[in-house]
UniProtKB/Swiss-Prot annotation:
GO CC annotations, alphabetized: cytosol
Annotated PANTHER family: GLYCEROL-3-PHOSPHATE DEHYDROGENASE, GLYCEROL-3-PHOSPHATE DEHYDROGENASE [NAD(+)] 2, CHLOROPLASTIC
Principal location class: cytoplasm
InterPro entries cross-referenced by the UniProt entry: 6-PGluconate_DH-like_C_sf, 6PGD_dom2, G3P_DH_NAD-dep, G3P_DH_NAD-dep_C, G3P_DH_NAD-dep_N, NAD(P)-bd_dom_sf
Family membership: Belongs to the NAD-dependent glycerol-3-phosphate dehydrogenase family.
One MF term in the entry's GO annotations: NAD binding
Binding site for sn-glycerol 3-phosphate: 87, 115, 170, 223, 233-235
Protein name: Glycerol-3-phosphate dehydrogenase [NAD(P)+]
Active-site residue numbers: 170
Binding residue positions for NADPH: 19, 39-40, 87, 119, 234, 260
A family per Pfam: NAD_Gly3P_dh_C
Length: 310
């Protein structure tokens, strides 16, 4: 059963990884004509983009800038809606994926798609929900109606930065929770990590211009809970492996796809230093990823910090 209220469209998806492939299935199920472009394969990008009404970027963070530049060189009509579905931060300019796309296409309708969306569950037909956020409400509604179904519910938001940062920042906290579970520290410790992790996300997001209340929604708390409570989460898997005492290189080699939190942590630490934001959990995750501490030492530092109000 189709629940979208838009006529069939052509949707181009950049990135053939787990998330890009899942989005393609969702769009095809709604009767749209979908073409997926993978930069590792010999596909004509111009042909993929031609006639598309919606362009979804689901490439890894490392691929966002080069792919955006290739698309800019090919060119797209001004009415094409750009959708950013990547969760990461640019390590050089400290930008979000949507900010990179926005800089490359300043006059294009731009939408952020984010939420608690584990690809494997969606591909199994299990129900899920997400948020499409944009300063252009019309664009957000177009994407909402194009992709929503009886198994994939979409909400709109006018806070694209908050929606995007929620999906980005929770990846680092998920690594911490994975470590916690590997050390068998219990439910109390896990609850404390998730709750204080959300507080860190809100501090960073609000300082950067996002609305604090956005982080209490699907793209913030919702995504945080899904990522921290599922062994399907790559970031959780990284933390669990580190908590078992395995080297990061080995853990990453055994994971399918990209654990963006590994590359997000140092960027968040840099942003926090620039803006004087307290991010103790993220700092300990960063030290652990750099091999500068052990899981037990990181825990001790978190527990022995100066006492303060919540």
């Amino acid at each position: 059963m189709k629940t979208n209220t838009t006529s069939p469209q052509k949707i181009a998806i950049l990135g053939a990884g787990a998330w890009g492939s899942t989005l393609a299935l969702l769009a095809q199920a709604q009767g749209h004509r979908v073409q997926v472009w993978d930069r590792r394969k010999d596909l004509d990008l111009k042909e993929v983009l031609q006639g598309s009404q919606i362009l979804i970027s689901a490439v890894s963070m490392a691929g966002v800038r080069p792919v955006a530049e290739v698309v800019r060189q090919v060119g797209i009509p001004p009415q094409v809606i750009l959708v950013s579905a990547t969760k990461g931060l640019d390590p050089l300019q400290l930008l979000t994926p949507a900010q990179i796309w926005g800089a490359a296409f300043p006059n294009q309708p731009l939408v952020v798609l984010s939420g608690p969306n584990l690809s494997a569950e969606i591909r199994q037909g299990l129900p899920a929900a997400a948020v499409v956020a944009s300063r252009d409400l019309w664009a957000a509604v177009q994407v909402q109606h194009a992709l929503a179904s009886e198994r994939f519910r979409l909400y709109t938001s006018s806070d694209p930065l908050g929606v995007e940062l929620g999906g980005i920042l929770k990846n680092v906290i998920a690594i911490a929770v994975g470590v916690c579970d590997a050390l068998h520290l219990g439910t109390n410790a896990r609850a404390a990590l998730v709750t204080r992790g959300l507080a860190e996300m809100i501090r960073v997001g609000s300082r950067l211009g996002a609305r604090p209340e956005t982080f209490n929604g699907l793209s913030g708390l919702g995504d945080l809970l899904a990522t921290c409570h599922s062994p399907l989460s790559r970031n959780y898997q990284v933390g669990y492996g580190l908590g078992q005492g395995r080297p990061l290189s080995q853990v990453l080699a055994e994971i399918e796809g990209t654990a963006e939190g590994v590359y997000t942590a140092p960027v968040v630490v840099k942003i926090a230093a620039q803006h004087n934001i307290r991010v103790p959990i993220t700092q300990e995750v960063h030290r652990l990823l750099q091999g500068q501490t052990t899981p037990t030492a990181a825990l001790a530092r978190l527990m022995e910090r100066q006492l303060t109000s919540e």
